[in-house]
Amino acid sequence: MKVRNSLRSLKNKPGAQVVRRRGKVYVINKKEPRFKARQG
């Protein structure tokens, strides 16, 4: 899991989902788990 300032490039990857949990924004990607990230 990476912490990124901007998730814009990650959310364009195939299989990416943008999820809000507890006020934080996450990108989860089942196809490519290395693209998991959190913003903030």
UniProtKB/Swiss-Prot annotation:
It comes from Corynebacterium glutamicum (strain ATCC 13032 / DSM 20300 / JCM 1318 / BCRC 11384 / CCUG 27702 / LMG 3730 / NBRC 12168 / NCIMB 10025 / NRRL B-2784 / 534). SUPFAM superfamilies: Ribosomal protein L36 (SSF57840). One of its GO terms (biological process) is translation. Keywords: Ribonucleoprotein, Ribosomal protein. Belongs to the bacterial ribosomal protein bL36 family. Disulfide bonds: none annotated. InterPro entries: Ribosomal_bL36 (IPR000473), Ribosomal_bL36_sp (IPR035977), Ribosomal_L36_bact (IPR047621). NCBIfam families: PRK00831.1, rpmJ_bact. This is Large ribosomal subunit protein bL36. GO terms for molecular function: structural constituent of ribosome. Pfam families: Ribosomal_L36 (PF00444). GO terms for cellular component: ribonucleoprotein complex; ribosome.
